[in-house]
Amino acid sequence: MTARRTLLDGLARDIDVFDLVSELVPLHPRDDTFPGEVFLRLAGDALDWCGASRADPLPLEGLRERFLPECAFRGRQNKKFQYAVLAAAALHGGTDPDLLDEVTWWQSDDFWQYALFAAVAYVRAAASRAGVPVRQACQDLAQRSGDAAP
């Protein structure tokens, strides 16, 4: 099963986000950003799916508190989550953020986890904006092609 599908299936079943991280650990090669890129693209797809645009943006204020309440980030963790959230929005907007340049200073191998947290928050926010259950948003997003990567 692909990283994208595993994340969407887990969200659709309302699996705890930390259990999702544990499920996805085997797909993450050490010292690599994968599957973070997959999760950022999924987050961008969620923005597209719910109709977020320059004319009708999805507010980021309170995103973590409203749509990822099970995660409490502190200090650098907040900055890492913020970067993943903004990188996903940048991808949705048509730019390609320089992930390697950014995550090198993190000095830890956890970018993919923050990308996962951002994707979870965006999928939940997109479902809320569309007025549908998260399960429905996940099913709709699963039908989109995404990437063929694992």
Provide a role label for each language-model segment:
Residues 1-150:
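Solvent-exposed interaction surfaces and binding hotspots enriched for charged
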